[in-house]
Amino acid sequence: MIFTLVNGCVNYSNRFFGEVLADPSLASPILFPETVFNAPSSHISALIGSAAPNDTLIADGTGFFSGLDLAAEWIERGDVDGCLVVSAEEIDWLSAEGLGYYSKCYLPAEGAAAVYLESADVGVRLLRLPDPVSFSARSRVEATVKLRAKLDAKDDGQTLLVDGRCGIARIDRPETEAWHDWKGARWSPRKLIGEAMGASVALQAVAALESVRAGEFQRAVVTATGGNQQAADMLIGSI
């Protein structure tokens, strides 16, 4: 299993440290691991009885793509038969305030979503997952434009575009410009459910997967431009 996130267990950590400050006798080292980034992944593996590889990736909002890429690598190497890629975020006042530094118009959100990736001949297929494009040597707009060219998705009326736009023009500019000529169906889930940070791309991916699985579209593009690291996307489809 691979768990991807931005914030981590903020509410649990706040509760833990609040109790410790109120009563230092509660400061047991046995409890401390519950507050670290890898705690959710470890708990889920224990819940499902998995002794397989388990990892947590901390990234910007595009981390779910990195999780899928690592899962595909594990499967190709024969380390695992299948991999559950999960992302979850919970919101508190501190993370909501942090979003406000980017824009006062952000709508903070939370949630969780997961995709199970395996080598099989049935189900929705991961057709393309190009390497992400870093912001280290180019702007966010340039990175997103280059990424679209690498994906080379066909605007044929049978392909859905599920983008990462949130309804704030300045934040949305990279994807707005990179996909300005897209004439097919286009969904922007964050405009409806808000900014769930690490979980947003996972929610986009599930929306895209369900649209293909239900036969609404033959293929779907999922794309996102991260806050400070990279732009990433993928193409999935039934054929």
Regions found by a protein language model. Give the residues of each.
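Conserved "HGTGT" condensation-loop signature of ketosynthase/thiolase-family condensing enzymes
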Residues: 2-59, 65, 73-80, 88-239
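Internal active-site segments that recognize and position negatively charged phosphoryl groups
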Residues: 70
